[in-house]
């Protein structure tokens, strides 16, 4: 299993959890971003910097993943594309996206986008809590045990 991270919006605390898991299990971890990142030095961790632009990092990830890989992302359309390639998708809050739930998540995302486009303020996600960090670590462990 290769772990890929949609790194531009991924919280640092989640990246730290991923660095430790990558080193502990000797799994390749690739962070894809449109800017240079400071990452933990490890033989298993690398970064890929892509040009700025809409979905450029997402497309880079989808182009390289293979069945069974894991992608960390809060981006619902990217998660849907990952699932189509028989890979795993996990949010930084520990939500595991699945073929059964992704279509509903896409509908909700599209509805919220329409509301924002019509001028309704929908607010953003809450700050990442300790419970979110623990949920992520637990979900990651469950996925990696299966690998």
Swiss-Prot record:
Superkingdom of this protein's organism: Bacteria
NCBIfam families: PRK00124.1
Family membership: Belongs to the UPF0178 family.
Name of the molecule in the record: UPF0178 protein AFE_3267
């Amino acid at each position: 299993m290769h772990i890929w991270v949609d790194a531009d919006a991924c919280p640092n605390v989640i990246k730290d959890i991923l660095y430790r898991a990558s080193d502990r299990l000797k799994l390749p971890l690739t962070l894809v971003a449109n800017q240079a990142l400071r990452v933990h030095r490890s033989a298993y961790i690398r970064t890929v910097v892509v040009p700025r632009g809409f979905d450029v990092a997402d497309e880079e990830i989808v182009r390289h993943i293979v069945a069974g890989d894991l992608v960390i992302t809060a981006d619902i359309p990217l998660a849907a594309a990952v699932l189509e390639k028989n890979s795993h998708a996990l949010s930084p809050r520990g939500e595991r996206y699945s073929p059964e739930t992704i279509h509903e998540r896409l509908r909700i995302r599209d509805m919220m986008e329409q509301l924002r486009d019509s001028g309704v303020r929908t607010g953003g996600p809450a700050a990442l809590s300790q419970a979110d960090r623990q949920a992520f670590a637990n979900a990651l462990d469950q996925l990696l045990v299966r690998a």
